[in-house]
A protein has these predicted regions:
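Bacterial Sec-dependent N-terminal signal peptides
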Residues: 1-10, 28
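Hydrophobic helical h-region of N-terminal Sec-dependent signal peptides
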Residues: 11-16
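Sec-dependent signal peptide cleavage junction
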Residues: 19-34
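N-terminal cap/lid segment of alpha/beta-hydrolase-fold proteins
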Residues: 44-92
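Short beta-strand element of the alpha/beta-hydrolase
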Residues: 91-102
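The serine-hydrolase catalytic nucleophile loop
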Residues: 104-116, 130
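Conserved alpha/beta-hydrolase
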Residues: 117-137
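Alpha/beta-hydrolase active-site loop
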Residues: 143-164
Length: 164
């Protein structure tokens, strides 16, 4: 990824974290998807089967969804759902998109629906709960912290970019 695209991703993440766009940030990273069972090359990250599904939208069973966890620079564990396209081929590279909702929203709501729809169109997508929201860690709940939320986006991009 070149510097201009990286800067644009950071700017979009900042705007979205502040609630200005409330949609998604395009990562434009090709995801090497050789073996997802190995999770990611990132330290303190994991991928597991999605159990106890609480999504509030109609679930497309053709899209494989994994439960993921990764740590941001502030030490918060960020919880997410990794959506894999229909007929996912681990020998191919895929474009990736990371998505979160506006303040207080969780991955089981609109960001998960967007992630599912993008996965239907061939993207690897990651919908995540911002720190201090949903299943992500942080003892101060429902608190806005643009710097931490921006770091959540950086950590999400790092996680997806480092998939094996």
């Amino acid at each position: 990824m070149n510097k201009k695209k990286m800067l644009m991703s950071a700017v979009l993440a900042s705007i979205i974290s502040l609630g200005g766009i409330g949609g998604y940030a395009n990562v434009q990273a090709a995801v090497p998807a050789n073996d997802l069972a190995q999770a990611s090359q990132m330290q303190r990250s994991s991928i597991s089967e999605l159990n106890n599904d609480t999504r509030v939208f109609k679930v497309d069973k053709s899209i494989d969804v994994k439960n993921v966890r990764f740590e941001n620079r502030y030490g918060y564990e960020v919880a997410g759902h990794l959506y894999l396209p229909k007929n996912f081929d681990s020998n191919k590279k895929y474009k990736a998109v990371v998505i979160t909702g506006p303040f207080g929203a969780v991955k089981e709501q609109s960001s998960g629906l967007y992630a599912q729809e993008l996965a239907k169109n061939g993207f690897v997508t990651l919908a995540f709960d911002q720190s201090m929201t949903g299943e992500s860690s942080g003892s101060r709940r429902n608190m806005a912290s643009p710097d931490i939320f921006t770091e959540d986006y950086h950590a999400a991009v790092d996680f997806v970019s480092n998939l094996n």
